[in-house]
Amino acid sequence: MTQALAELSRTPDQWQMPIKTPLGQMTLVADEHGLQGAWFEHQAHIPSLSHLRWGPNMHWLCESRKQLAEYFAGRRQQFELPLRPYGGSEFQHKVWQALAQIPFGRFASYAEIARHLGQPQAARAIGMAVGRNPLSIFLPCHRVVGSNGALTGYAGGLDRKVALLQLEGSLL
């Protein structure tokens, strides 16, 4: 099953759950329709989540935690969840949808994503949208590299990006 990106609609019934991963603490955010956010602790661009209720038994949070554990254990390469990115402009949503198309174990450059979106001069804007991806790992922004193949920034930290790419067999 491919990742489904649904339209964002902020609802009063949004829930959050902190989880532990091999790369540190994350917070997951979901509503009744799917996963909306996944941020590492101290990651750049985390919105305020203080207004959200804790949802330890909420279906999409539990399913997201389960699939993420399978990913880290090497038993999952693709997530099967409805993804509803928290916030973002129409352009950012297009970029985030493009991230969902980058296969496990592969890379794409900012310039390749810009060309894919029909905006070959927009690599810098692509980079800014990638940096604000609200669904770390689930929308694989860690698979985006510079045009020369160099590892560039990751809102969760470059060390985490390296670890994720190693987990996927992209780096030795």
Predicted regions and their residues:
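A generic hydrophobic-helix recognition signal that picks specific residues
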Residues: M17, N133-L135
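Basic nucleic-acid-binding alpha-helical/helix-turn surface characteristic of O6-alkylguanine DNA
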Residues: M1-Q121, L167, L171-L172
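…primarily DNA-binding HTH/wHTH and HhH modules…
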Residues: S147-L172
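Regulatory, non-catalytic segments
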Residues: R124-N133
